[in-house]
């Protein structure tokens, strides 16, 4: 895309091939390519002369180019060298601040994942929520600009992302599970910062105002360009997902968010360009999910980290007195 931008001023020129191929067909009919070949090669004809020569004889004293043999190790490695290993500690399930807490005892870095259930959402609401996750990095909060908050997240957290995840479960009936996921990796001493910054990032980003509306237009335009480029590069994969969307809920949701259907949804928002209405819709969906949907918190860390998390959550934005119950995401297949 950058090449088209540099030479023509249009970043999407090379992504739309209809005009390009139409121009090439026109030149093909007019004999333009034949004339080009004539101009390039007719003035200086090329002649290739083959001179047969006998191959050189190998030097009898030279070392052979290849030595046949088999590598023999003094102590070949086997499965027994791995040992039995340490068995993984069993996870512990509990509840805190209206959320289900899963603790997986481990040492080293701490991994904190929050899963908001999306089983009660419609397809359109999931589409809006998916767009929201693409916007969060570009939005200010009452306390920080987007750049300041991103810098703080990079400083205190090894990684922190928000996204939509969905998969087909192994339970009876193979239900589709859909979640809004906030993932953070960090050092144990930064757990308090993770709760603070993760909450600000997910709950407090401003979805109204001039800056937010400018971010909506900017991010959606870039998303549209990215999807068009991916259609060209991986069109077969998008076609496969679109075909599977008629048979499995997981693929239907994938198609709605990041497939051709999702692309058309995104194009519709760009054509309407009603950013104030989009901000209100995103606020409504965020309110429904963050404050009412079932929340499961997964912690990979020490017992001390678990105790600290249980102390931090009740006073955080993640705490709710009552939440709904998790359920499978359903969608009528066409």
Tell where the protein language model's regions lie, with residue ranges:
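Proteolytic maturation boundary segments
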Residues: 3-127, 264-334
């Amino acid at each position: 895309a950058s090449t088209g931008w540099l030479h023509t001023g249009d970043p999407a020129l090379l992504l739309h091939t209809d005009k390009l191929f139409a121009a090439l067909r026109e030149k093909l009919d007019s004999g333009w390519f034949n004339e080009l070949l004539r101009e390039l090669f007719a003035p200086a004809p090329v002649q290739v002369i083959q001179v047969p020569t006998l191959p050189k004889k190998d030097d009898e004293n030279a070392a052979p180019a290849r030595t046949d043999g088999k590598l023999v190790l003094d102590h070949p490695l086997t499965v027994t060298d791995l040992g039995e290993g340490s068995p993984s500690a069993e996870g512990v399930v509990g509840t805190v601040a209206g959320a289900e807490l899963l603790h997986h005892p481990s040492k080293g870095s701490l991994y904190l994942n929050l899963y908001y259930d999306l089983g009660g959402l419609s397809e359109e609401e999931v589409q809006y929520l998916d767009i929201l996750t693409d916007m969060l990095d570009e939005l200010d909060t009452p306390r920080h600009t987007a750049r300041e908050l991103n810098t703080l997240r990079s400083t205190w957290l090894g990684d922190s992302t928000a996204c939509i995840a969905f998969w087909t479960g192994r339970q009876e009936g193979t239900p589709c599970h859909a979640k809004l996921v906030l993932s953070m990796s960090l050092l144990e001493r930064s757990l308090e910062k993770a709760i603070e910054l993760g909450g600000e990032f997910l709950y407090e980003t401003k979805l109204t105002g001039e800056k937010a509306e400018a971010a909506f237009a900017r991010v959606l335009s870039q998303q549209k360009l990215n999807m068009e480029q991916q259609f060209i590069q991986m069109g077969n994969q998008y076609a496969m997902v679109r075909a599977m969307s008629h048979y499995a809920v997981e693929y239907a949701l994938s198609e709605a968010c990041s497939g051709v259907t999702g692309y058309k949804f995104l194009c519709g928002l760009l054509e309407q360009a009603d950013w104030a209405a989009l901000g209100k819709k995103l606020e409504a969906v965020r309110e429904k999910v963050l404050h009412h949907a079932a929340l499961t918190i997964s912690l990979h860390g020490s017992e001390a980290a678990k105790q600290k998390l249980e102390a931090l959550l009740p006073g955080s934005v993640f705490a709710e007195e009552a939440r709904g119950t998790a359920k499978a995401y359903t969608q009528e297949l066409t």
